[in-house]
Regions:
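Walker A/P-loop
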Residues: 27-47
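A substrate-engagement module of RecA-like helicase motors
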Residues: 2-7, 57-166
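Conserved structured core elements
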Residues: 11-15, 39-43, 68-72
């Protein structure tokens, strides 16, 4: 990852954000970034975090977002970095209610077909996902959960333990 380069020409202020984020990670501190829409904050925070993980300054990246559009931009940022050589496994965790196949989220084997026998099948589902995919978004998780007849949310959490980056859409 040390040879991974920023995938765009730097816009005004981006290099400062990238440098600040990397320095913040390396010194185990916190940073607050405020900049106008369109500056490139997402890539300017994800890129140095990826480089920091590559330098052994962290193990995983957690990208928290409250908006669908921000989640999508984060997914796209990781995708662009992958096109430039990044070898990361990335998962997007969304709210249980948004992943649940049922009308009501009653997570128990008596009320939920997807919870019934979940533990018998989930390891195979996670193994297949892990060995065939690198990005685990909502659609991919739903597809494999249906295929294996497991709870998509619980499968998502099981898979999240192993990935390099978690995009967490908490709405």
């Amino acid at each position: 990852m040390s040879d991974l380069e920023f995938p765009f020409e730097y816009r005004e202020g981006q290099r400062k954000i990238v440098s600040g984020v990397y320095h913040t990670i390396s010194t185990e501190r916190q940073i607050f970034v405020q900049a106008p829409t369109g500056v490139g904050k997402t890539m300017s925070t994800i890129f140095p975090a990826v480089r920091a993980v590559g330098a052994g300054l962290g193990e995983n990246i957690f990208y928290l977002t409250a908006k669908t559009i921000t989640r999508t931009v984060a997914e796209e940022a990781f995708s662009i970095l992958k096109e430039h050589g990044l070898k990361f496994k990335v998962i997007t965790i969304t709210a249980k209610e948004k992943l649940c196949f049922c009308d009501k989220t009653e997570c128990n084997p008596e009320n939920c077909l997807w919870a019934r026998g979940h533990l018998d099948r989930v390891n195979d589902a996670v193994f297949e996902l892990w060995t065939t995919q690198d990005s685990y978004d909502r659609d991919t998780l739903l597809e494999y959960a249906k295929k294996w007849q497991v709870c998509p949310f619980e499968m998502c959490l099981d898979l999240a333990v192993w990935v390099d980056a978690v995009i967490c859409d908490y709405n």
